C-alpha cells in the first residue's frame, strides 16, 4: 500500500509540473535585488526608485518592450532579469557606425556587457535610428534619464 501512495503522489506531482505553464519565478522585487546587478548600480536604487518607476508604468514580465538609449544599462540590468518569454526586451542604442566617438564607445561598452553575462541572453540590440518594431507588436517603449 505504501508504494501505491508513493506512485500516486509522484504521478500527481508530475501532472501538476507538466500542466503548469513555465513562467519565471522572478518578481519585480527579485529582479531589482538580483545578485547579477552591479553593486555600483544597486547603490543608485535609493535615488532612482526602480520599483516605484516600473510599477508606475505597469511593466509586466510578459511584455514586449523597447528601451530607448539604455546608456550603460542601469535599467537594462533590471529589465533583463524581469522580462521573460513570451515577453522580450530590445535595447535601441546608439548607431554602431556613428561618427561620434562617444556614441561608439557607449555602444561598444553596452554590447560587451550584454555579451559577457548570460543574464542578457534574451536582450536584443538594435540601432536607435533603425526601425525598432511594428507598433502593434510592442507593449511599451521606455526611456529613462536621457532627455535633458
Where are these regions (language model features)?
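Bacterial N-terminal signal peptides that target proteins for export
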Residues: 2-12
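Bacterial N-terminal signal peptides
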Residues: 10-20
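Class I SAM-dependent methyltransferase Rossmann-like catalytic core
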Residues: 28-56, 60
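Conserved class I S-adenosyl-L-methionine
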Residues: 61-71
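Glycine-rich SAM-binding Motif I of class I
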Residues: 73-77
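S-adenosyl-L-methionine
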Residues: 103-130
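A short acidic, Gly/Pro-enriched loop at the edge of an enzyme's catalytic core
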Residues: 131-141
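A conserved beta-strand element that flanks and buttresses the S-adenosyl-L-methionine
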Residues: 142-146
Amino acid at each position: 500500500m505504501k508504494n501505491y501512495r508513493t506512485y500516486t503522489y509522484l504521478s500527481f506531482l508530475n501532472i501538476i509540473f507538466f500542466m503548469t505553464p513555465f513562467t519565471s519565478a522572478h518578481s519585480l522585487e527579485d529582479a531589482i535585488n538580483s545578485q547579477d546587478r552591479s553593486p555600483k548600480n544597486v547603490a543608485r536604487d535609493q535615488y532612482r526608485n526602480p520599483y516605484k518607476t516600473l510599477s508606475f508604468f505597469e511593466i509586466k514580465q510578459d511584455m514586449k518592450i523597447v528601451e530607448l538609449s539604455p546608456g550603460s544599462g542601469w535599467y537594462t540590468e533590471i529589465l533583463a532579469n524581469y522580462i521573460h518569454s513570451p515577453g522580450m526586451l530590445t535595447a535601441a542604442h546608439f548607431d554602431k557606425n556613428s561618427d561620434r566617438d562617444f556614441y561608439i564607445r557607449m555602444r561598444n561598452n553596452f554590447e560587451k556587457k550584454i555579451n559577457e553575462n548570460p543574464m542578457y541572453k534574451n536582450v536584443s540590440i538594435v540601432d536607435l535610428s533603425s526601425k525598432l518594431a511594428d507598433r502593434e507588436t510592442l507593449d511599451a517603449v521606455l526611456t529613462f534619464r536621457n532627455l535633458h
